[in-house]
Amino acid sequence: MRPAGRSNNQVRPVTLTRNYTKHAEGSVLVEFGDTKVLCTASIEEGVPRFLKGQGQGWITAEYGMLPRSTHTRNAREAAKGKQGGRTMEIQRLIARALRAAVDLKALGEFTITLDCDVLQADGGTRTASITGACVALADALQKLVENGKLKTNPMKGMVAAVSVGIVNGEAVCDLEYVEDSAAETDMNVVMTEDGRIIEVQGTAEGEPFTHEELLTLLALARGGIESIVVTQKAALAN
């Protein structure tokens, strides 16, 4: 039996609260069960030096966890004087995922930064960050259109992510912390709204997994992401 009696293919309740803060062009509080992440999208005119003069935009991301988002307090990385490898890996993943959602040529020479701050962690913080940041990004892009900075919205479609894994020999979708810490296999999957894969991060924590198990996990992820995209679109229609 999974926590909260979920079936193996069931994601936790997902909530997306838009316009959560007043200053950012896009802001969303995303909740996957007890995992809560604040995602903001900030627009700046201009692009990084390596893109200057190419007539295209850029999307980047930063990720961080509040000191008491976890069971015991973790010192802020700013206080340590450097970012950890996990943080850098996750923010690069978020940025790659969100760049797949946008026509960067149509964006023009704007940079959009997605800041994902974990308020409470109970597994799946990176997948929640991608899911919430995509909605914040959609709001920011719409503001560019409304303000006359862009003629058309460069958003190609929604992008969402979910974790899957093998726990006690069973393939499950959207792992909570207690499942994640006991998983034999742990995988994060990012997809477009039509089911095309952007990224798969998979690791055998204990027992190596088979090709058949990989296909099962990808199918589980696709089903979970389809339901998450429905929630994203409903939030944006509100």
Swiss-Prot record:
It catalyses: tRNA(n+1) + phosphate = tRNA(n) + a ribonucleoside 5'-diphosphate. Keywords: Nucleotidyltransferase, RNA-binding, rRNA processing, Transferase, tRNA processing, tRNA-binding. CDD domains: RNase_PH_bact (cd11362). GO terms for molecular function: 3'-5'-RNA exonuclease activity; tRNA binding; tRNA nucleotidyltransferase activity. Phosphate binds at R86, G124, T125, R126. The keyword tRNA-binding applies. Its EC number is 2.7.7.56. It holds the Pfam family RNase_PH_C. Coiled coil: none annotated. The keyword Isomerase does not apply. It is an enzyme of class 2 (transferase). It comes from the Bacteria. Homohexameric ring arranged as a trimer of dimers. Phosphorolytic 3'-5' exoribonuclease that plays an important role in tRNA 3'-end maturation. Removes nucleotide residues following the 3'-CCA terminus of tRNAs; can also add nucleotides to the ends of RNA molecules by using nucleoside diphosphates as substrates, but this may not be physiologically important. Probably plays a role in initiation of 16S rRNA degradation (leading to ribosome degradation) during starvation. Belongs to the RNase PH family. This is Ribonuclease PH. The gene is rph.
